[in-house]
């Protein structure tokens, strides 16, 4: 949703292949997340030791979701900078949603990776997403202040 809502700000109405690819992949990830989680639960219910690969597969969609959200946070900078000011609220919503996606994915990733002692730098991902979010927020605030003077 966040990836598509930021398009409301676009002045040129041009294709953003990067956003299109992110959006398409996110749709696929929804089903992968469900499928891999179901496979993990099915294995767990057998009462035997669950192979590490099931945990890793269950974590992968959320891990990719984090990467795609970070990529989108970086990509929307130019849209926030140059997009329609009358649609800035859409940019604010997209910026905030993308950061929350990164934060909210972490518990699921942790639940799936902790049993197999697989390392993942949760703090690094969140910190980088916050950095991009803050940069975008500064652009938004600057544009809103500029609007006040017009």
Set out the residue ranges of the language-model regions:
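Conserved, well-structured ligand/cofactor-binding cores
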Residues: 1-150
């Amino acid at each position: 949703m966040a990836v598509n809502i930021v398009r409301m700000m676009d002045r040129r109405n041009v294709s953003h292949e990067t956003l299109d690819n992110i959006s398409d992949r996110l749709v696929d990830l929804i089903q992968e997340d469900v499928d891999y989680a179901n496979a993990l639960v099915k294995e767990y219910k057998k009462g035997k030791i669950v192979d590490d690969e099931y945990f890793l597969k269950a974590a992968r969609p959320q891990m990719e979701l984090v990467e795609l959200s970070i990529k989108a946070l970086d990509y929307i900078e130019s849209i926030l900078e140059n997009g329609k000011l009358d649609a800035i609220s859409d940019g604010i919503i997209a910026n905030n949603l993308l950061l929350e996606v990164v934060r909210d994915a972490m518990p699921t990733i942790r639940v799936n990776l902790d049993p197999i002692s697989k390392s993942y730098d949760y703090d690094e991902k969140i910190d980088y997403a916050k950095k991009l979010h803050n940069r975008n927020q500064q652009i938004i605030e600057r544009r809103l202040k500029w609007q006040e003077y017009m």
